[in-house]
């Protein structure tokens, strides 16, 4: 489900629906910050013509960033970066054979001139990229950071009040 209030600014693409639980985290933060996006499943290997059309049309659709997740050979993020002229954030997926190391290496070891950012918090990085030219979004990101800070402060206050043993016990519930 995409936020369709405006033209999507972020494309979220994954090679398989099994990647959805991880990719949904990026969608969740984009929704929280009010950033319109489009989410789709495309296999770069099984439907290359559909993939090429997606990557070629992304700029025309208004995308400013693509978040691409893939496992195993994980060519999806790199191929997006080869075609799409704006930032691509790659998310390596866990795999059963190598625990995701194959995906990670495939995404981070790109040839010169074809960068793919590979980070945790891909949705937040996409938002920060967009915020470089959007003052309203920058304000939302600052408020989000303040909220996170306040959550940590509240946890520490609770720890100081009840002690670590009671805190740990409360975490088990």
What are these regions (language model features)?
Residues 33-63, 157:
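Active-site rim loops that border cofactor/substrate pockets in soluble metabolic enzymes
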Residues 98-140:
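Short, glycine-/small-residue-rich phosphate/pyrophosphate-handling segment
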Residues 1-7, 173:
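Basic/polar N-terminal segments that are highly enriched at the extreme N-terminus
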Residues 5-46:
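Glycine-rich phosphate/diphosphate-binding loop of Rossmann-like nucleotide-binding domains
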Residues 19-23, 47-51, 70-79, 98-101, ...:
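Short glycine/serine/threonine-rich phosphate/pyrophosphate-binding segments
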Residues 133-173:
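Glycine-rich phosphate/pyrophosphate-binding loop and the adjoining helix
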Residues 54-92:
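Glycine-rich phosphate-binding loop
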């Amino acid at each position: 489900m995409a936020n369709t209030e405006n033209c999507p600014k972020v494309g979220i693409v994954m090679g398989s629906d099994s990647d959805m639980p991880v990719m949904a985290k990026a969608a969740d933060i984009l929704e929280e910050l009010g950033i319109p996006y489009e989410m789709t499943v495309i296999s770069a290997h099984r439907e290359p013509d559909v993939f090429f059309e997606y990557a070629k049309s992304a700029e025309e659709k208004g995308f400013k960033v693509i978040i691409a997740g893939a496992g195993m050979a994980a060519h999806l993020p790199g191929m997006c970066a080869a075609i799409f002229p704006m930032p691509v954030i790659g998310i390596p997926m866990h795999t059963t054979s190598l625990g995701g190391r194959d995906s990670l290496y495939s995404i981070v070891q790109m040839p010169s001139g074809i960068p793919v950012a590979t980070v945790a918090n891909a949705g937040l990085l996409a938002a920060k990229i967009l915020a470089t030219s959007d003052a309203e979004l920058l304000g939302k990101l600052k408020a989000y950071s303040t909220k996170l800070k306040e959550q940590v402060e509240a946890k520490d206050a609770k720890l100081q009040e009840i002690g670590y043993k009671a805190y740990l016990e409360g975490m088990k519930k």
